[in-house]
Amino acid sequence: GFDKEIIIKTIKTSGDLFQNKKISEIGGKDLFCKEIEEKLIKKEIDIAVHSLKDMDSEETKGLTIHAYLERNDARETFVSKSFNKISDIKEGKIGSSSKRRELQIKLLNKDIKVESIRGNVDTRIEKIEKGEYDGVILALAGLKTLNLKNHIKQIFSLKEFIPTAGQGIIAVQCRENDEDTKKILKKINHINTEICALAERSFLKTLGGDCDTAVGCSAVLKGNNIDLEAQLFSDDGKEVY
């Protein structure tokens, strides 16, 4: 059993607050994590819960991810009011919050104009409903969690639209020297998710990319093997590997 009281502390990060600028302009995805990690280091909190996709591939000194919760769906979706498929758009405007998604959209449909879109999932869907954009690419995991699946028009396979590393995974972090908390977190760790997460993060770490690097990566366990799909774009977006 578990006999400790858990107090949940909600922390608004700079990534949540500055939603009128591109992620890369305000310090990258890591901005969603750094301020929470600082509170963990200062012992203001004992456990930090992150979306793994927002975390740096390098572990923060003194901290450790000690639990990966079972992965939600890692796939990407197309949300639109007027179109059923992204290929149906002849001339239109799609909202994207990342360079990776922007370049992947162009591979699927070169006629589409891609413009930056920020805000939480509700805000982005509202912009679609108002006609500000013809569609937007959103993570299926977020839409499922928020019960917004009814807005989905198309779900892409992991091969046709490779997601960002760690998509759909919740990572639970604690201090490296906090043995009591580590024992607790070990009990909720999902080993298959951990294996895939480590494979994806190792790939990112090897590349040495940052928030401006357009790269997708998805690992799936198949028996004793890991099937890792990856996609990397050159800085100018003209080459894809």
Tell where the protein language model's regions lie, with residue ranges.
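Short beta-strand and adjacent tight-turn residues that come in two discontinuous sequence segments
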Residues: 32, 50, 137-139
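Small-molecule-sensing regulatory modules
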Residues: 1-25, 102, 107-241
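Short glycine-rich anion-binding loops that position phosphate/pyrophosphate groups of nucleotides
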Residues: 52-55, 141-143
